[in-house]
């Protein structure tokens, strides 16, 4: 079975083709970063309009890259949520239209499940059950994954998502949007512990996160100090250290509470090298394993959607429902299936 995956939940247009036996055949991503840079964040209306302009040419490009024709595609998977309503509707409409024209099934995919399964695209893959830390611009969640479709949200951010805070602080430090990766690069030049920021909610029971207080503390520090290169780097280092240590403490707590030894990190922020290094050391001391996708599969992409779609289509979970998207959609609402690959 070959599945065409379409991702349009936010500001990346992603299209990929995944083959059950040969793996990933093609993966194309168009980023709207430059389009939204002047606004300091994603503008939903602009995002949707740009998806409309780019998605059909990108599908043609992906088919050509894989040297395939529509008749060689057995199913279509598309991100139906969570995400921006207008952006989601573009991908869903195109996917359902092509499925009808090509006479093949289509399946709606949960964006965060696709991220959770992204490490499965690598040669070394995790096995269920495991704890997943999903960190992106819109989500910060700790999830217990017992099987595909069997998820329990152990904790999540009660305010800002990690990626969102990274981008906001990066802008205040004079970096361009999206600035998460640029902030991390700046932090490498920072002096450790010149500034020390709070690790929010680590002394409270439970696994929820809160980053609004850390954001406010960092903003106040930026505003009340000089903006020379070294000082900005020191602030970036303190901010990143606080984020990473907070995430790690909650991950360790989740592993201890569940007795699991396998941790998966995915989502855009999981590409952060400092976060990966910290968690690798932590899992080594815990005699556990850490899994994460390569950087191009951390950010939004069609490959993870195609893979998730393959699993669900093989389980017979396609539907002929009209175009439907869910801007808000919990992982816990997904149907459970047995892993069949």
From Swiss-Prot:
Cofactor names: Fe(2+)
EC number: 2.3.1.234
Comment on bound cofactor: Binds 1 Fe(2+) ion per subunit.
Cell compartment(s), UniProt: Cytoplasm
Keyword Transferase: yes
Binding locations of substrate: 134-138, 167, 180, 272
Domain of life, per lineage: Bacteria
GO CC, alphabetical: cytoplasm
Keywords assigned: Acyltransferase, Cytoplasm, Iron, Metal-binding, Transferase, tRNA processing
tRNA processing is among the record's keywords: yes
Pfam families: TsaD
Known catalytic reactions: L-threonylcarbamoyladenylate + adenosine(37) in tRNA = N(6)-L-threonylcarbamoyladenosine(37) in tRNA + AMP + H(+)
Major site of localization recorded for this protein: cytoplasm
Residues annotated to bind Fe cation: 111, 115, 300
A GO MF term: N(6)-L-threonylcarbamoyladenine synthase activity
GO terms under biological process: tRNA threonylcarbamoyladenosine modification
PANTHER family recorded: TRNA N6-ADENOSINE THREONYLCARBAMOYLTRANSFERASE (PTHR11735), TRNA N6-ADENOSINE THREONYLCARBAMOYLTRANSFERASE, MITOCHONDRIAL (PTHR11735:SF6)
NCBIfam families reported in the protein's UniProt record: gcp_kae1, T6A_TsaD_YgjD
Similarity field: Belongs to the KAE1 / TsaD family.
Biological role stated in the UniProt entry: Required for the formation of a threonylcarbamoyl group on adenosine at position 37 (t(6)A37) in tRNAs that read codons beginning with adenine. Is involved in the transfer of the threonylcarbamoyl moiety of threonylcarbamoyl-AMP (TC-AMP) to the N6 group of A37, together with TsaE and TsaB. TsaD likely plays a direct catalytic role in this reaction.
Protein name (database record): tRNA N6-adenosine threonylcarbamoyltransferase
